[in-house]
Amino acid sequence: MNNGLGWASGRKSWLALPLVLVAILLAALFSDRAGFRPIDWENYVLAADRLRAGESPYQGVEFFAPPWIAILLIPLSLLPIELSSGVWLLTSAAAAFSATLLWTRFGSFPSIPRSKIMLSALTAASPVALYVYVTGQITALAELALISLAVLVGLSQQRRVLIPTVIAALLVTAKPHIVAFPLALILLQSVRARRWKVPIVFGTTILIAAVVSWVLHPGWLGEWLAGLLAGQYLGGPGLAARGYFGLREAGVPGILLWLPAGYALLYWIRKGLTASALALAIAGGLTLLPYLRIYDHLVLWPAAITASGLLRAKGPRSFAAVPLAAMLLLPLTDLAMLLPPLIVGMLLVRVTLGSRSAASN
């Protein structure tokens, strides 16, 4: 029976291929006609072009990802920017949709298939996602890679991990600062559960990618670190949003911003890699960051969905809409920086109350 289902699933995938190709073509034509050229996507393409020519992808370019991201983008950089922008837009939207769909599987909320689809569509059309599309950022692919690794490690029935882990390892490091903490817990969980394939493949992939990058441009490591430490991403020339104002700039003591991540670590030690633990790690990791753009808040959607599920399960159903509404509304205001601690607070309230209720029973 399983073989038949697998064959049928594979056949459906092949039948969907023409539709995917048509969608890519339409997206490319749209960007060509509309003159759609996101500023960060232009920087990605320029970095890929320079690396292909043996030059530095960092000097004079607002590119802060590891060089293997530029290597992966070389095929798209061969296209005219007007066409590749549309393909990138479609890729980002598909990644944002797929990341939420995967998360609903990992977190088992919502349970109704139609609700999963609707929620995935909502996140892919949310303001933070639109910021990703307009700027041409790679955040959606980093989010999808992070959730994919969580599924590979957290769901024991996964068998084929080589290719998914390789792809996820390359993409998740595109935005290392926003995924570092939850990624660390995912890899620690794989070691804790003695599922050695994921961390071994992950580490080997990054090592090979670093070596290949060194062959193409030996000085990449020093240039990448120099670019990160220079801090031009805090509002350098040409960025879509100049300057930066976050929680630290608002006067919040730095030590307080580390507390959610500390609690998430302790919760993971006690409970393992549950949806709540990873949601706390995502929100806590974003809270402690000294730098976070609006488009980076896309990674916060899984935590908001988990908070919504907990509120619905352990309180009035109307409360479940609060984290989702916050994700839809706050990015449209100057209060977007409050999103991570707000989601952390909702998670902590429900997780803490749930733990006390279980203890009393």
Regions found by a protein language model. Give the residues of each.
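Helix-loop-helix junctions and helix-breaking kinks within/between transmembrane helices
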Residues: 130-141, 169, 174-181, 185, ...
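Aromatic-enriched
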Residues: 308-361
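Sequence-pattern detector for short linear motifs
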Residues: 14-15, 178, 296, 353, ...
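Membrane-interface alpha helices of multi-pass inner-membrane proteins
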Residues: 161-187, 281-289, 323-329
